[in-house]
Amino acid sequence: LAVTSAGPGEGKTLTAVNLAISLAREVNHTVLLVDLDLRNPSVHECFGFQPERGVADIVLQGVPVSEVLIHPGIDRLVVLPGREPLAHSSEVLSSPVMLALVQALKHRSANRIVLFDLPPLLSADDAVAFAPHVDAALLVVEEGKTTRDELTRAVGYLRNTELLGTVLNKSEESVAGYYY
């Protein structure tokens, strides 16, 4: 499952992290959270660690996956972090080595849920190039920021990927408007 957004700052990474934690706590599967926002890797910051190695080290230098995985202290949750921003991220994300890595991660265990934190769809072509390699996507939109045009364009970029739905983030619904 890919988690992405139309633009930057809409909360896709925090949504991916919270979803990963929730799934690890609620289901009987392990959860692997992979930081593929290689231009701005930040999943590790949500857990308060600075990785020595990241996904790019696996793809570009052949570092074994087991040497990059981080266990953040939550049962059944494992993180494959990014590390430092990567300028040529779209080439890395579409490389044969990356695609083989994704297939290996997806099929490594039948009881594993794999979440990919992808870059925003409208910021670069990274997420658009990678989206066909996931089973489904979740689109995060920020209330009051994401325009209808941006949402339409983002959904269009995901037309060849099953879109499970959208997450309305940073909503400021008033208590007065809420009732049972």
Where are these regions (language model features)?
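P-loop NTP-binding module
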Residues: 1-180
